[in-house]
Amino acid sequence: MRKMLADGGISGVEVASCGTKYYGDLEREEVMCRIAAEHGYEMGGKAVTMTEELLNSADIIIVMTEYQHDEVTRLLTYSHWDRIVRFNEYCFGEPTDLPDPHYQTEHVYRTCFDTIERGCREIVRKLGA
């Protein structure tokens, strides 16, 4: 997302990614990093834990699944719940979950990556409009 924003000449947007199931430092999965690198994206670092402070400071919170939506509402101040959107709905107008590829086949990762890449392009388009 950061690379797409920079390539699109869009500044002033802060991007953060965090997990809803992980606490503490967790290395990113090798297959995910490899697929991203094949497409010119850097996925270094460790997974970031979702925190109340991080969520409440966000203008928009894009989740992949309804489960993640529910997890976010547990930490997010009620008055900010309108900031939560599901990825497929925000990007494509489809009220569906984006399946979690973690610990599945490489094919599932690649399919998920393609959807995320298309969706991120749509987000950049919306921000640049």
Where are these regions (language model features)?
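Conserved active-site segments centered on acidic
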Residues: 1-58, 125-129
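Phosphate-binding/catalytic loops
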Residues: 60, 66-129
